[in-house]
Amino acid sequence: MADSVPKAEGFQPQDWFPHNPDAHGTDGPLHIEPAPVYPIADCFFESFQDKGLPYRPDMFSSGETANGCGHAMRSTFKGSRTTAADYITKDQQRSNVTIMCDVTVDKVIIERGPNNSLRATGVEYLDNSGKRYKAKANYEVLLAGGTYNSPSMLLRSGIGPRQDLEKLNIPVYVDLPGVGKNLQDHQLIFTYYEVNKPGLTDDERVSHDPDAWANGLKEWQEKKSGWLATFPFGAFGFARLSDRLDRDVPEWRNMEREEGRDPMGLTDAQPNCEFFHTVCYGGPPEYTDFPKPGEFALAMCVFLCGQRSRGYVTIKSTDPFEPPFADPCYLSDKRDLLMLSEGVRWANEVVTEGKGTRDVISGSWPRGATHHRKKTNEDWHEHVKKYASTSYHPGGTCKLGQDDDPLAVVDKYLRVRGVKGLRVVDCSIMPLLMSGHTQMPAYGIAEKAAEYIMQHNKHRSAGKHKGSAGFQQGARL
């Protein structure tokens, strides 16, 4: 994966940012740049360093440390966000790719061949009126529906746990117990604090001005600048916290662990939590208590890495328009609660004791809240249970694994077990969610899949090759 991710990146260096050129790609379609630094971010960088996180500007691209602070990259350049759409539009547009919008894939078409072998030959999909169509695959079908929809499509296709399929009267093609299992998601918690000094946050532009949104949108539309064109977060950090738990929490200290790993299963080279802060008030879950003119607030955010809780995704019916049912089973493993609580505890120490922030933070927000006074790991448990939520980083539900892994759905080439001509290409294939954000790994998975497909098809002449997933709209059924 390390050689695949940079292929997606078109890094845009900035004079102020000391980047590591070996950690970035320059020719990819995604325009990537470091986020600009707000005044409040300088305060947090000082506090992070005061609390033991060395400053490593490009650490989130280089992967050089699990204990440091630096700058996050963003897929925004000159005020515009770049996305996967840039692979198939603009300079990357290709004549052999047909994009169909406002359609919903129901299932993969599977046909039996010699010796009862199975092959994916296309998909069935519906338009918004419910009319059903077929698309034929010349070579392969690639599912890229994401962690929730890829397993749903497999289940409706008859690929998944036999008992789940039979409950819905879906003919079973392949009994794959792991489809929809192993759901993981980084839990994220926003904890709010009051800032007592004007000019550090962006609240004047965001909360205080009743016309802020209209003016911000107008500025962005006309100039691609302003607060809607930038990144609402500041300094970022990674930290190892297991030693703190060993010191202060007997339950953690007595937990089983493999040699060289903490109870989360992580080594010293892997962070336990990520930390960052907003540059104004805002964030889940309530979107209330916005500061009035003369008031300023922000959130300190803690993001759990290496979570041990596992959930699942399934379908309740064969209706492709019915959303899948997902239960992430957050905090079902006690280790997650202890570690996330420790992350929030340490973050609170950064905010209230760190050299750069202690004099500009008045206490908790909204006024009257007292969470800034919490001291022990246990003190934070109820806060974490109440406020921890999703970071929208799901993965794992079409797990990649060895043949002897009963929950493996795809092999190392991303091919679905038991069916030829079918791959899954998205974050659902991750056996373990990485200790970081999923955006660039998702592109890396796609780049790696492209390599596999080209290797598989290299014997075909370029003149006859029509694309590994050359879907063509078929007749209405």
Give residue spans per PLM region.
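Conserved redox-cofactor binding core of oxidoreductases
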Residues: 1-111, 119-120, 191-194, 202, ...
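Intrinsically disordered, low-complexity domain-flanking/linker segments in eukaryotic proteins
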Residues: 5-18, 114, 122, 248-264
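Short coil/turn segments at secondary-structure boundaries
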Residues: 10-16, 58-63, 84, 198, ...
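Surface-exposed beta-strand-to-loop junctions
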Residues: 21-29, 64-70, 164-166, 319-325, ...
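Mid-to-C-terminal "cap/lid" subdomains and adjacent gly/pro-rich loops that border
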Residues: 25, 34, 151, 161-291, ...
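A structural signal for well-ordered alpha-helical scaffolds and beta->alpha junctions
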Residues: 37, 41-42, 80-84, 158, ...
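C-terminal structured subdomain/cap of oxidoreductase catalytic cores
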Residues: 96-193, 197-198, 298-356, 381-477
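Structured beta-strand/loop patches that form or line metal/cofactor-binding pockets in enzymes
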Residues: 285-305
